[in-house]
C-alpha cells in the first residue's frame, strides 16, 4: 500500500529520534531519502549507512533550516543528486522548556526561526519541485502543544501552531497540482535528547496518557509513510494526532 519506489524524500532532522525512524520507514517503502541534519552529523551518517546496507538509497545533507539560503542550496543539491523531490517532511525543531516569564527574546527568535521559519523556508524552496512531481507531499511533525497548549512550551507551541496554518494554506493553494500538505501532532515521544528529564518525571508523565506509555518513533513513522504514498492522496489540510489519547480534540 505504501509503495514509494521512484520517489525522493527530504527529511529535516532526519538523523535522530523521530526523524531517524521516518527516514528509515520511507526508505523501507522504496523512497530515496535525503537525510538533513544541522549539527548531528554522526547520527545522520549512521542512518544513511543503515539504509544503504539494507539496499536503499540515502545521502546526508547539512543545513540549518533557519537559514533560507542554506535550505535553498540543500534542495538544489537533492535535485542534482536524485533528480527531483516528491516528499518533504518538516521534522526538525527546537524546544526550550521554560516558564514563559523566564524566556528571553533570544529564546523566542531561536524557536520561531527553527520551528516556523524553518518550515516556511523548506516549503518555499521545495514547492516548485513538489508541484512538478504531480504527487508532492508535505508532512510537518510537531508536538500536540501546537493544538492544545502546554505549560513551559508557549513559544514553541505558538511557532508550531503557525506551521499548522501553513500546511492548511498550502493544501488549498497547491492541491490543484496533486500536492498534499498535512500536520502530525505528537504526544511525548521517548528520545535520547530529553532522556534525563523523562526518566525523572516518567511516572507523572505516563499518567497523562490513557494508553499508559509514552510514544516511540515507530508509532509515528508508519503514518508518515502512508501520507507520503498514493494511499494518502486524498488526505490534505489535516492535523493527525498521534498522542496515545493525550488530547482528543
Task: Locate each region found by the language model.
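Short C-terminal tail/terminal secondary-structure segment
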Residues: 3, 148, 204-208, 225, ...
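Conserved glycine-rich cofactor-binding loop
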Residues: 8, 15-17
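Catalytic loop of short-chain dehydrogenase/reductase
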Residues: 97, 139-162, 167-176, 188
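Substrate-binding pocket helix/loop in short-chain dehydrogenase/reductase
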Residues: 99-100, 104-112, 194, 205
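Alpha-helical segment proximal to the catalytic Tyr-Lys
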Residues: 128, 172-173, 233
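Short, small/polar-rich loop/turn modules that mediate ligand/substrate recognition or access, typified
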Residues: 135, 175, 180, 235-237
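A glycine/serine/threonine-rich, flexible loop-to-helix segment
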Residues: 172, 176, 183-209
Amino acid at each position: 500500500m505504501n509503495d514509494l519506489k521512484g520517489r525522493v524524500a527530504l527529511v529535516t532532522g532526519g538523523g535522530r529520534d523521530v526523524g531517524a525512524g521516518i527516514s528509515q520507514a520511507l526508505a523501507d517503502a522504496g523512497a530515496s531519502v535525503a537525510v538533513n541534519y544541522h549539527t548531528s552529523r554522526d547520527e545522520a551518517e549512521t542512518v544513511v549507512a543503515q539504509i544503504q546496507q539494507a539496499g536503499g538509497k540515502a545521502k546526508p545533507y547539512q543545513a540549518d533550516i533557519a537559514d533560507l539560503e542554506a535550505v535553498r542550496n540543500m534542495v538544489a543539491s537533492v535535485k542534482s543528486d536524485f533528480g527531483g523531490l516528491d516528499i518533504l517532511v518538516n521534522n526538525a525543531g527546537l524546544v526550550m522548556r521554560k516558564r514563559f516569564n523566564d524566556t528571553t527574546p533570544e529564546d523566542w527568535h531561536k524557536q520561531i526561526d527553527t520551528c516556523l521559519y524553518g518550515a516556511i523556508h523548506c516549503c518555499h524552496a521545495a514547492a516548485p519541485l513538489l508541484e512538478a512531481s504531480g504527487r508532492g507531499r508535505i508532512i510537518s511533525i510537531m508536538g500536540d502543544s501546537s493544538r492544545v497548549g502546554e505549560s513551559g512550551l508557549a513559544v514553541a507551541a505558538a511557532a508550531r501552531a503557525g506551521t499548522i496554518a501553513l500546511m492548511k494554506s498550502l493544501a488549498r493553494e497547491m492541491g490543484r497540482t496533486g500536492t498534499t500538505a498535512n500536520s502530525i501532532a505528537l504526544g511525548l515521544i521517548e528520545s535520547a535528547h530529553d532522556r534525563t528529564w523523562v526518566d525523572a518525571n516518567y511516572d507523572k508523565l505516563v499518567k497523562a496518557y490513557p494508553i499508559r506509555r509514552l510514544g516511540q518513533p515507530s508509532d509515528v513513522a508508519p503514518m508518515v509513510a502512508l501520507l507520503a504514498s498514493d494511499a494518502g492522496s486524498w488526505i490534505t489540510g489535516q492535523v493527525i494526532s498521534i498522542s496515545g489519547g493525550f488530547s482528543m480534540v
